[in-house]
Amino acid sequence: MWISGCWKAEGNVQAEEHWTKLEGQSMLGMGRTVVNGKTVFHEFLQIRERADGIYYIAQLNDEPPVSFKLVKLNPNQAIFENLQHDFPQRIIYGRVIDGSLFAAIEGVEKGKPKRIDFAMRRLRCD
């Protein structure tokens, strides 16, 4: 899948994701958010095939893992969804023509729609 590799979003907050492709449709990933040079958030990520579909599984900090089912896949976009989760309910990855990666999380928080976008560029994986 085209999200394999290392990615970084910059701005007031820096976010990184590192993805490794496994066999089939499976991948392993790690994400972290850095503010003022300090990691304030980390997550372990998986994309895994199950009998009923493909799932994006995120385990944030020390919390239990949360699964999001793949609901849309085309050559340039993957959308994962879990409408029972508090926030986000949807995770979106998009491949941009310049080789960068677009990611977004969206859903409803405190009764109001919320969306956070990440424009990510490829890094060299160390």
Task: Tell what function each PLM region has.
Residues 75, 100-126:
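Edge beta-strand at a domain terminus
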Residues 14, 88, 115:
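Short coil/loop residues immediately preceding or within conserved phosphate-binding loops
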Residues 3, 9-10, 14-84:
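Central antiparallel beta-sheet cores of small beta-barrel/beta-sandwich binding domains
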Residues 24, 98-99:
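Short, conserved beta-turn/loop elements at beta-strand boundaries and strand-helix junctions
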Residues 75, 80-82, 86, 91-95, ...:
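Well-ordered alpha/beta subsegment
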Residues 1-4, 106-108:
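Short beta-strand segments and strand-loop junctions that repeat across beta-rich extracellular domains
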